[in-house]
Amino acid sequence: MKISDGIQQSFKNYIQSLGGKSIESYDKKGGFIAIGFDLNIHGQTVPLSVKYIDQKRWLSLPTVSVAQCNLPALDHVGNNGLICVTDHQGEMFDSADLFGLFKYAVDTAISILTNALESYSAGNRKALYEEIDGYNQTVVSDDPIVIATHNPNQSDSLYAWCINLTKQRNTPQCHHIKYLVDGASQHPPSSNPYTAIKVTKIILPRIENFVIPNLFTSFDEHWWEQQTLNFSTQQLDSLNKKSKFKIVLLEIPTPKMRTYLVISYYQDMASNKYRNFKIQTLQRGWREYLLNRTGMESQFSSKKPVVIAGCGSVGSRVAEILAESDVDKLILVDYDDMKTDNIMRHYLGIQDVNQSKVSALKNRLQQNIPELEVVVYKTNILNWLNSQNDEQLSEMHSIVLATGHPPTELEVCRRYILTRRMSKLYLVG
């Protein structure tokens, strides 16, 4: 059921009691209502908007945003103007107490803005710098994030995998950046529409060298010009040596970790103006970081490859699980092509029918985990083992037998376990 007119009016009355001006409500998509108003906070007239769902019970708190402008200079205010009022609280509340929840959200937002404006007026950016990693994830840009499949701090040669969005010749280049990879070992697969572009890495010596925009400004070309004033001569030289289309990885040191921004633009050398300027946040997607977050201990610390013999319904799922663990390299062995009969049980799908199982599985795994090395052999496991000498086999961590053919699996056991040419063999399925 919808909120009564009396409760709606109580919301407006409360805003008016706080000194709110130009109060008006309007319907939003999806059954939401928003109340917009102006409020003087610490000497600044700030346009605010409170959005809530038009129901008699609320399962989530109203959202409070700065309307019609961005305030990236302020603590806890996102690039889209959203004010963080919950701080992971509010899961336990009376869903029927609409006025109480409305009042809590508005009061908390005003308190946050008051403190943030006081800090800004005093030139105090300490809170922003202390939470710079989370700050960058929420306030810098609404553009899609870039996924780093390799730790940028451990690479001297970084490349961006991009999709070229340039529509016409002789126009400023524009690219959609998808991945950031270690250039020494990774290149875009030819089957994908990616272009590899060299990345310039700029490391700031101190966190205070990161420029936070002033009030009512945002992260744009003017911000970048201010940021480059903090670069060393050597850093500026490395930046200017690159092509007209530039991709820069800005590394910001923090007490706990390094945080990163990806800046891309086309620089018109004649006018020295920036075209297609874009700033994106970086999502950590390299294996060590993800495993540390999950608390998993690696079972493959030797970094030796794992062989999967048979890439059917069982073997393909084993490959998926191993790819998401700490395995750096998989060797896939299967002589068969994908059939429609396999679709309901297989990791692959209808789009892979009539393709080699090992090739299709390799493409699917590397789409999800680009840094994973996958080597494929379209043959049966016995032929593959016969092609390997003892030294090559000793380099394998283990073989997973998922052929679904007991005579073949027994023969592998007889030849390579009983003769101790392999130390680990797993039978699945």
Question: Residues of each region from the PLM?
Answer:
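Beta1-alpha1 glycine-rich phosphate/pyrophosphate-binding loop at the start
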Residues: 202-206, 211-214, 329, 335-344
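Glycine-rich phosphate-binding loop and adjoining beta1-alpha1-beta2 segment
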Residues: 335-371
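Domain-scale recognition of soluble eukaryotic interaction modules
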Residues: 65-155
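Glycine-rich adenosine-cofactor-binding loop
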Residues: 297-337
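A structured beta-alpha segment of the ubiquitous adenosine-cofactor-binding alpha/beta core
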Residues: 362-398, 403-407
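ADP-ribose/adenylate-binding Rossmann-like module
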Residues: 398-429
